[in-house]
Amino acid sequence: MGEQVLVVPREILFCNESTAFQGFREENAHPYLRMIAESSLFLPRDDVEEDPNYKQIIPYAVVSHAPPAGSERWFLMRRKKGGGEKRLHNLYSLGVGGHINPVDDHIDDGIVERALLRELEEELSVPREREVNPIGLLND
């Protein structure tokens, strides 16, 4: 069996397209996090990768650092050539993210945050005790 990823049926997430959008939307993510907790399930990634009926939930973090006496700095990462997704090889990312898998524990209100903290720890060695602040939603 292949990789399992967290998905939500598109019709539930976007109320039969009445709330659908494309790109980034700065808004309160908490209603969507509740919807994810109540309506998500794990399915094989190969089955949903090209299926428009399911939205894969992929937490993504943009990381900044504001030193006490300096200007804010932003994390930028160049993807390795040997990474999993060939379309991303040698490209730059402004943040870090990844699919939510069953390893991220049970499905509840905190699953998206736990998965994001796991990803930050894996990619950047950031301790999981950090605070994350949702600033919006990205739909692609």
Show where each model-derived region lies.
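Active-site segment of metal-dependent pyrophosphate-handling enzymes
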Residues: M1-E11, L41, R45-V48, N53, ...
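Extreme N-terminus nucleophile/cap motif
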Residues: M1-R34
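Short N-terminal helix-initiation segments at or just after the protein's N-terminus
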Residues: M1-V7, L33-F42, H89-I100
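Generic structural motif
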Residues: E11-L13, A66-P67, H99, V103
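Acidic, metal-coordinating catalytic segment for phosphate/diphosphate chemistry
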Residues: F21-S71, R79-G84
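Conserved Nudix-box catalytic region and its N-terminal flanking loop in Nudix hydrolases
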Residues: E72-R118, E122
